[in-house]
A protein has these predicted regions:
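Short glycine-/acidic-enriched loop or helix-start segments at secondary-structure transitions
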Residues: 12-14, 68-70, 97-100, 116
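Conserved RecA-like P-loop NTPase ATPase core
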Residues: 2, 58, 91, 121
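Short histidine/acidic/glycine/proline-rich micro-motifs that form metal-
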Residues: 6-10, 63, 111
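S-adenosyl-L-methionine/SAH cofactor-binding core of RNA-modifying enzymes
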Residues: 26-87, 93
Length: 139
């Protein structure tokens, strides 16, 4: 699940749709867009009860954890093995705060436009699933 602030615009829309089609073979992916004034908190799943295995919320953030592609694929597989759906939250141009996020993910040390961050995230999700499936794509 990718929850993003703001409406995706060209040329990024086509790239996101491209990776969405590629990912469909490997995983169910839902993209939800919210207006900047709407806030993301009300669209996120409720926190699981103590010891529960509800959704895992990861906020894309400059100060988040960075992974190489293989480690990111293991991160996803660990959540899958735990029976947890992963929700990635992509903030708007001014960022966003998600207090219930269990994890903060950085796509790298450079600042990216929030719409480009969606493309990079989907490409990395596709790459991770190809790695997990043992299929060629990642070199």
């Amino acid at each position: 699940m990718v929850l993003a602030v703001g409406r995706l615009r060209p040329p990024f829309h086509d790239d996101v749709q491209h990776y969405r089609r590629l990912l469909a073979r490997h995983a169910k992916l839902e993209l939800i867009e919210v207006r900047e004034d709407e806030g993301v908190e009300r669209r996120l799943p409720r926190a699981p009860a103590a010891g529960g295995s509800g959704a895992f919320v990861s906020l894309l953030a400059a100060d988040g954890r960075q992974y190489d592609s293989v480690a990111f694929s293991r991160f996803l597989e660990d959540r899958r093995q735990a029976g947890r759906d992963v929700w990635f939250v992509v903030g708007g141009p001014y960022g966003t705060d998600v207090p219930q996020a269990e994890h903060r993910l950085s796509l790298g040390p450079m600042t990216l436009p929030h719409q480009l961050a969606r493309v990079v995230l989907l490409e990395q999700l596709y790459r991770a699933h190809k790695i997990l499936a043992g299929e060629p794509y990642h070199h």
